[in-house]
């Protein structure tokens, strides 16, 4: 099955590669992560390059699909590309959305600046906790957007999620006095 889907990759979706997790083969937001991981491991055991001929391409496609679907940001970007042909992985598209909400960028930059000036771990942990809560809130809102087919709101939330994910990376890189880079 996987071999067939990989060979006709141009018509298949990542959801089709995991028929037990997604029996309807339709893009959905809410995912049973443990079921996805279990099915991924089973398929990987069958199609790993060491186990099957032509396994390298199949394994690579399977890896890409799994990592896209398990990560909320990448999943949302993928769903928007699939459902509305909006590619938020392209910087220009993402920037167009950001310019429509300059307050978002200012808020992210303010928090990033505050983080770079911090010298105590307790303050950083508090900011990091607040950022994790923002991310969880946006992920919940995205679920509602996809259920309601409100793709315009999903676009804005996905761009916002990308900024908060990048800020989460800055928390991991933080050390007192260390210069932090801000990616967007």
From Swiss-Prot:
Which keywords fit this entry according to its UniProt record?
A: Chaperone, Mitochondrion, Stress response, Transit peptide
The J domain sits at 13-82
Location comes to: Mitochondrion matrix
Instruction: Respond yes or no to whether keyword Transit peptide is given for this record.
Output: yes
**Mutant lacking the gene: phenotype:** Increases association between GRX5 and SSQ1. Inviable vegetative cell population growth.
Q: Which domain of life is it from?
A: Eukaryota
Residue interval of the organelle targeting sequence: 1-10
InterPro entries reported in the protein's UniProt record: DnaJ_domain (IPR001623), HscB (IPR004640), HscB_C_sf (IPR036386), HscB_oligo_C (IPR009073), J_dom_sf (IPR036869)
Q: According to the UniProt entry, where does the motif HSP70 binding sit in this chain?
A: 48-50
CDD domains xref list: DnaJ
Main subcellular location of this protein, as a coarse class: mitochondrion
Q: Does the keyword Cell division apply?
A: no
User: Which Pfam family, any one of them, does this sequence belong to?
Assistant: DnaJ
Q: Reported effect of changing residue 49 to A?
A: Decreases JAC1 ATPase activator activity. Decreases vegetative cell population growth. Sensitive to high temperature
Offer an example of a GO molecular function term for this protein: ATPase activator activity
- Variant or mutagenesis effect after changing residue 50 to A: Decreases JAC1 ATPase activator activity. Decreases vegetative cell population growth. Sensitive to high temperature
Q: Which PANTHER family match?
A: IRON-SULFUR CLUSTER CO-CHAPERONE PROTEIN HSCB (PTHR14021:SF15)
Family of the protein in this entry: Belongs to the HscB family.
- Subunit details for this protein? Interacts with ISU1 and SSQ1.
Q: What else is known?
A: Present with 2010 molecules/cell in log phase SD medium.
Protein name, per record: J-type co-chaperone JAC1, mitochondrial
Q: Which organism is it from?
A: Saccharomyces cerevisiae (strain ATCC 204508 / S288c) (Baker's yeast)
């Amino acid at each position: 099955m996987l071999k067939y889907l990989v060979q006709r990759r141009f018509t298949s979706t990542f959801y089709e590669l995991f028929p037990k997790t997604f029996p309807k083969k339709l893009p959905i937001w809410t995912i049973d992560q443990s079921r996805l991981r279990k099915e991924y491991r089973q398929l990987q055991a069958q199609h790993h390059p060491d186990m099957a001929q032509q396994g390298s391409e199949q394994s690579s496609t399977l890896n890409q699909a799994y990592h896209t679907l398990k990560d909320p940001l990448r999943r949302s970007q993928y769903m928007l590309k699939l459902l509305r042909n909006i590619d938020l992985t392209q910087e220009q598209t993402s920037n167009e959305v950001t310019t429509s909400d300059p307050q978002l960028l200012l808020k992210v930059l303010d928090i990033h600046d505050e983080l770079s000036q911090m010298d105590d771990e307790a303050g950083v942990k508090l900011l990091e906790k607040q950022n994790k809560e923002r991310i969880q809130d946006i992920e919940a809102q995205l679920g509602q957007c996809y259920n309601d087919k409100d793709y315009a709101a999903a676009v804005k939330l996905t761009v916002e999620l990308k900024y908060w994910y990048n800020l989460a990376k800055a928390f991991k890189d933080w050390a007192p006095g260390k210069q932090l880079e801000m990616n967007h």
